[in-house]
Amino acid sequence: MIFLLEVAPAFRETFWNMRHWWKAIEIATFALAAIPVILLIYGLYLRFKLWRRGQPERFERFNLLGRRLGLLVRYLLTQKKMFNDFWAGAAHALIFFGFCILFFLGAMLDAINLHVGEHILGLKYGLINGPAYLVQSAILECGGFMLIFGVIIAALRRYVARPKHLEQSRQAGIILALLFIVAITGFAVEGMRIEKEMQTNPEWSYWSFGGYIFANIFSAIGLDGTPPIKSFHGPHVTTWWIHFALSLALIGYIGLSKLRHMFTSAANIFLQSLHPRGEVPPIEKIVEQERWGTSKIVLFS
C-alpha cells in the first residue's frame, strides 16, 4: 500500500504562534482598528470643512476624468515635484513607495487572504501560496527596506544637514519615529517566525531576506529554544502587539498631522484647474459687483 503525503506549498500562517486564540485576536484587531480609522476620517473631515469656507469654484473640477486620473498617476509614480531637492525627493519616494508596498501588498492582501481565502473559500493555504507567496514576500522585504532607508535619509537631512529652509517640528520627529519603529518591529516579528521556519522549510526563508537577517540574530542570542532564552512565545506576542498598536497609531495620526498630505496632495492634483495657467474666470454681472478682488481668506475659492 502506498501512502501519499501532502506537501504543503510555501505559505504564511496567519496569526502564527497565536493560533490557539486567534479568533479573539481577530475580533480585538477589528475593534481596535476602528479607532484610528475614525481619527483619520475626522482629521480629513476637518480639512474638508476648512476648504468649504472658500467661495464656490467657477471652473469645472470633475470634467475630463481620464486626463485628471492620468495626471494623478504620473505625479504619484514620478514624485516629480519632490525632486527639486534630490535628498528630500529620495527620502519621500522611498517612504511613499515603501509604505504603499507594505500597506497594499502586505496588510491589505493578508486581510483578503484570511477573510476570503480561509474563511469564505475554506482554502487551507489561503489565496496566496506557492511561488506567488514567495514573490510577495520578496517584494514586501524590499518595501520594508525602502521605508527604513527613506526614514534614515529624512532624519539625517532634518537633524544633521539641517537646511535653512526646512522647518523643524516635533510632529516630523514623531512621524519618522513611528515609521521607523513600525518597520523594525515588522521585521522582528517576521524574523521570529522565520527562525522556526528555517528548521522545517529553510528554502522559503531566503525570500524573506529582511526577516532572515533578524532570524539569524535571534538564533545567535538563543531565541530558538536554547539558552539563554528558552521560549520565543512571549517575546513574539509582545513584539506583535507593539507592531500592531504602533501601526494603528500611525494610521490615526495621518488625519491629524502633515501626513494627511497623502490625501490632500492627491486631491489637489486630481482637482486642479485644467485651464491655461493664470486664466481668470469671467466675472458675472460685472456692473453689479460691489466688491473687487479678495481681502479675506474666505473670499478665495
Label the predicted regions.
Residues 2-301:
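Membrane-embedded alpha-helical bundles of multi-pass integral membrane proteins
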